[in-house]
UniProtKB/Swiss-Prot annotation:
Provenance organism: Dictyostelium discoideum
Family: Belongs to the Glu/Leu/Phe/Val dehydrogenases family.
GO MF term list: glutamate dehydrogenase (NAD+) activity
Modified residues (ADP-ribosylarginine): R763
GO cellular component annotations of the record: mitochondrion
Name recorded for this polypeptide: Glutamate dehydrogenase 2
Cellular localization per UniProt: Cytoplasm
EC number(s) from the headed UniProt entry: 1.4.1.2
A biological process term (GO) from this entry: glutamate catabolic process
Amino acid sequence: MLNQNLTISQEIAAQPKTQYFTKEDGDALANLLESNPYKEQAVEVKSLLKSERLIESSRVEPEVDWFYCKLGLDSNYFDSTPSIVIARHILSLYAAKMVSHATGAKLEVHLHSKNEGSATFITPSNPGKRDSPAMMIEHAIESHYFGEGYHQDQQLLSPQQVAVAPFPVSPKPPTGTNLPPHGFRLACYRTTGTVSNSSPVHLRLYYLTKPVFPQATNDLSASKNDEILATETDLFKIGDISFIEKSSELTKKIYQEVMNEVVGKQGPVIKHYPYQTNGARLVIAYRRGSTHSYWSAIGELYHFHQMYATHKYVEQFSNGITIYSIYLRPLHPDVDINTKISKIAEQASLVYVLPRTSLTPLFLSHQLSFPEVTYAYVCWKFAYQFLNRYATEYSALAAAIGDDSTKQSMLAQLKTRLSKDTFTEGRVRDAVLQYPELIKILYQDFEKFHFSGSNSNNTQKYDVQHGSEILASIKKTVNNELDSQIFSAILSFNRHLLKTNFYKQTKTALSFRLDPGFLSTKEYVSTPYAVFFVVGSEFRGFHIRFRDISRGGIRIIRSGNSTQYDHNSSSLFDENYNLANTQQSKNKDIAEGGSKGTILLSADHQSKAEVAFHKYIDGLLDLLLPNHEIVDHFAKPEILFLGPDEGTADFMNWASSHAKDRGAHFWKAFTTGKSLSRGGIPHDLYGMTTRSIHQYVLGTLAKLGRNEADCTKFQTGGPDGDLGSNEIKISKDKTIGIVDGSGVLLDPQGLNRDEIGRLASKRQMARYFDKSKLSPQGFFVDVAENDVKLPNGDIVESGLIFRNNFHLNPLCNADIFVPCGGRPESVQLTNVDKMFTATGESRFPIIVEGANLFFTQKARLMIEEKGAIIFKDASANKGGVTSSSLEVLAALALNDEEFDRHMCVKDNVVPEFYENYIKDVHHTIESNARLEFECIWSEHESTKTPRSILSDLLSNKINSLNDSIQTSSLWTDQSLRRKIISAACPKVLLNLLGVDKIMERVPEPYVKAIFGSYLASRFVYKYGLNSNEFAFYTYMETLKQQ
């Protein structure tokens, strides 16, 4: 029983049998302290503790002496930790002992103290144990002090770990205001000794402090300082003041070396150094915010390899760089430290790419290694894209149903539901979790084709038919057909993989270049030239191109909720394929074939668009640039030409600069849509896409004898967007309705043109329309509003749903409909009937599809059946791709000095060459649009073939003829070649360089593509779809004589 008149501390002192230290212990410790190099500091700590009088005075000496002499903390701790902080740590430990004594329970040390500028955590240390309390502490520190935690699967943590957590465990990554401007510094130490003789508990101590950086330059703005700091490498300018003062010269030298390297890189810098006998120092530097959960994942990695940390540090720098320094030792002393540390350093790069996923439990339970579990994650995401389909059955039923649109619509809905219900993402994941032994077999197969090590001769030669024995193993192992299909899809991934950066030492995302032979020709009638698959911790995406020389935009796909994310993830490849295929059709007039890239942001990383884009581009460049670490089974040079699309317009400058930094010779042409100062031609500023779309509107009205000013028009895509704003600016019609991101703006009497023109000039949403300028029948319904009463008395329950479906609403009727925005397949078989009036007529007699894939092909055909005139996207909106193609041509034809002088706008001064080049681009766009419009109109008049089909037939014929021309002897005719290239190139470029210099500078495959596309398109537009070989011969003879 405790004496109620004594404090707990006094009680302990009064009962020698329960003391943690005997008098003999104290004497021995005092003798040890005499030779301790930190004796003076210990004396100061004793003085502090005695002055606070929280520990019984007779206990201060042995407690402090044990802490310094027996606990076994690294000397770095005493060098870098202030005496007052050490005193608090000793007091915390003593408090734990008092609680243990008072309760009679086993000594459990779970201590944490926090204030605004620092925090301390002390916990038992059990190296290599998954259930160690230290693991929970590190997760909490990572989330709340580094701002980079993301623990997707809370089942990874035991109830005991959650119970001792110093904070609530959140599965979400920090975003927005939750992310502190700089993470905390961390010093972590593991004791080699125990708490006392009677309690053999080793401890791990975490000490966190806010960094204090040197003051920023006072005469610069905050944004300018941030810009300068991002590239600053001098530790004395960007390091914490205490770090600079107290770190050893060796540490500063190592940190300076990695800092110099990491600032110019996208990914991490990982190095290791020998430390004492059979120890190693692992140093990792990376840009903060570029990954998540990295700190805890690195700990799990070295635990997997039977290593533990004696002490470790996290240092933050004001330029945004974080550096880890981890001192490792093997759990078993006979282990070769060199082999272990090399393996850890090698895999740390892979951990950076995918630190934590739903498959991480397979790694933590040692069922799979980290490379194996990373491979499994990639295969899971890949297989999911190509399993959710019933191609054979669907084709058979669709053929049996025939032209019955209602039944076709029902069949399409049934197929979608069956596919999603059968192969959900979770269903595929569960199969992977159930059969890790199959993943091991498939990974070994993957490794032997793509890991070269030090000898490239070790790798197997590419063989798309390999793996029959693996297929047999799959069928023997799994117990149902669905799982068999899943693992067969993974084997197909292996079989068709031509190159990957998986084994490249530094990378930011995993990228894979695939032969498209794995695609079903029933589902994907046109086979692409190449498919790239890119996976990062914040995203996954594809890049698809239909020709070697191809160009297309990169699209960020965001998801507002889990339902939308499920839809976006299941349709990711199909959306990418359809966009690229449409691009291929519309690119028939230009040198590049069609391509498209998509980046699907992960559900919990919707704010990481820029980080995801950077990694996506870096991953693609890994496979485009020569690298001895990558086994290249394709063995041909490749170039991608990229452009802006949804969510990426602001990133084109960076992508071009990054390609230059990485040594890509094609850097100027790598991206279009760059800023004026970088020689870009912004589509929105010059209305490039709209210029093509509007030619179809004007052409149709001219054929019908209508005056544009007398026609009503409805458009999706508002005055804040590229197409929407320029459609308002260029048109002279009576616009009655606009739908954009803010809501629905409608006035049957016609919207005030001055007012919508004002919004278009300022690029403002429709919600900023002056409502006083609406007629009594006019209204605006905001997406955020509910239960809104319209002028006709109808009640709008949800503004968001009203906006999403307004193009299908009977209130919306006009002579012309120009979709300038909206999601793909907004009109399809399941809802196209809503486009018609009660008498079966189209609510929009004229439709020019400005937005890509707004209608499905079957929906277009049904609309045409009702008598409407519709021109599909591949024909109507090709102005943007024409502009981008000519932007690429200028970048390839001009050398660096010429490009800077003639194409880059500086200080708002537009070079004369640039102004004239824009005029030439406008002329080319309008000419191409008029030629195709006239061809489609003429063919429809003579054959009655639907215009939507004619558009495809034209593209197919031109593209097919282009391919034939490029492989024919026509290319060898020097005179013809010069003549065609002269006709195809902008006049101002010809005047500057001359045709011979253009042909000399531009890569031959690109020149050949210009030659073929120009010849093929001009012939087909002139002679039509039914032209024969004799007509082509006549055409060629005419050209040669001109």
